[in-house]
From Swiss-Prot:
Protein's name in the database: Anthranilate phosphoribosyltransferase
Residues that bind Mg(2+) 1: 94, 228
Species of origin: Vesicomyosocius okutanii subsp. Calyptogena okutanii (strain HA)
Organismal lineage: Bacteria, Pseudomonadati, Pseudomonadota, Gammaproteobacteria, Candidatus Pseudothioglobaceae
Binding site for Mg(2+) 2: 227-228
Catalytic activity: N-(5-phospho-beta-D-ribosyl)anthranilate + diphosphate = 5-phospho-alpha-D-ribose 1-diphosphate + anthranilate
Length: 339
């Protein structure tokens, strides 16, 4: 199937099979389609709604072109990454969580990029902290094995995406590439907590990752619109564990945490975000600390360092109050520039 045939099919609201989608996406990722064709295809998919098989196929193709990072011990390997696009301008919660999980004994292969729709992307705030973003795959692997955290800057690992960059900028809408970003971790992490920008993606993404062989996954979207576990409202969850998917709703009060005001954790830039991250990692009582505890607790749970979400959040709070998570940030800055 070529892209013209695919467009004709999706405008009829007909899903593509995995094989059909892989053929079309391979052509896009190798520069064999025009910008007009790629644009029409992406818009058509977005209007139709991307199916589980279509998303799975795109992830497979992107992974096949990815510059991979090899991690020897994957038992507690995890990523904390979201689709972004919630438009709320909050600080980099999932980035802060990475240091808490590392302090808990996890191995965090953090996948991220500069801010596109947000005030601060994970790459922006890490650069503000002094982290070297231009590490080779070997150095990233060493950092993960030595201190429990490494950062994989998306443009370095996904060169083939370049064929879609201009089209996506011109379209200025969410496309399938926004959905698959967190699913294309270069270290092939078996465990993840993933935030998505709409509730409609929560359960489908869990099914995609089941098809792709993931081990333990939590996908979240909150009632108040976050691609994180919210400190201010209910959060919808799909959990993949032992090959089975279950859905449920959680609230901060389930974990003994008070509801917080999201206005307290909004930022204007990466420097603002870094301040909130440092305060949370120092254990300063705040909305920032509590939302980091919720999300890092989920990550601690999915990478098998806690037996339940409740235990994971409890461990995260103890780590935050001890200040050792901030030490992990300092260690990472040092190792990224010299390891």
């Amino acid at each position: 199937m070529n892209i013209q045939q695919a467009i004709k099919q999706i405008v009829k609201k007909q899903d593509l099979s995995q094989n059909e989608m892989q053929k079309v996406m391979n052509d896009i990722m190798t520069g064999k389609t025009t910008d007009t064709q790629t644009s029409g295809f992406l818009v058509g998919l977005a209007i139709k709604g991307e199916s589980i098989d279509e998303i799975t196929a795109v992830v497979k193709i992107i992974r096949s072109f990815t510059k991979s990072v090899t991690i020897k011990n994957t038992k507690h390997l995890v990523d904390t990454c979201g689709t972004g696009g919630d438009g709320l301008g909050l600080f980099n919660i999932s980035t802060a969580c990475a240091f808490v999980v590392a302090a808990a004994g996890g191995s965090v292969a953090k996948h991220g990029n500069r801010g596109i729709s947000s005030k601060s992307g994970s790459a922006d705030v890490l650069k503000a902290a002094g982290v070297n973003l231009n590490m080779s795959v070997e150095r990233i692997s060493k950092c993960i094995e030595k201190i429990g955290i490494g950062f994989m800057f998306a443009p370095f690992h996904h060169h083939s995406i370049k064929y879609t960059t201009n089209v996506r900028k011109d379209l200025a809408i969410k496309t399938i590439f926004n959905i698959v970003g967190p699913l294309t971790n270069p270290a092939k992490v078996p465990n993840q907590i993933i935030g998505v920008y709409t509730q409609n993606l929560v359960e489908p993404i869990a099914h995609v990752l089941k098809k792709l062989g993931s081990k333990h996954i939590i996908v979240v979207h909150s009632k108040d619109g976050l691609d994180e576990i919210s400190i201010a409202d209910d959060t919808f969850v799909a959990e993949l564990k032992n090959g089975k998917i279950k859905t449920y709703t959680i609230n901060p009060t389930n974990f003994g945490l008070p509801l917080g005001n999201l206005d307290d954790i909004k930022v204007n830039n990466a420097d603002d975000s870094l301040i909130l991250i440092q305060q949370a990692l120092d254990g300063k009582d705040s909305v920032a600390k509590n939302i980091v505890a919720l999300n890092s607790g989920a990550a601690i749970y999915v990478c098998e360092l806690a037996n339940s979400l409740q235990e994971g959040v409890s461990k995260a709070l103890k780590i935050l109050n001890s200040g050792v998570a901030h030490q992990k940030l300092d260690d990472f800055v040092r190792e990224s520039t010299g390891c």
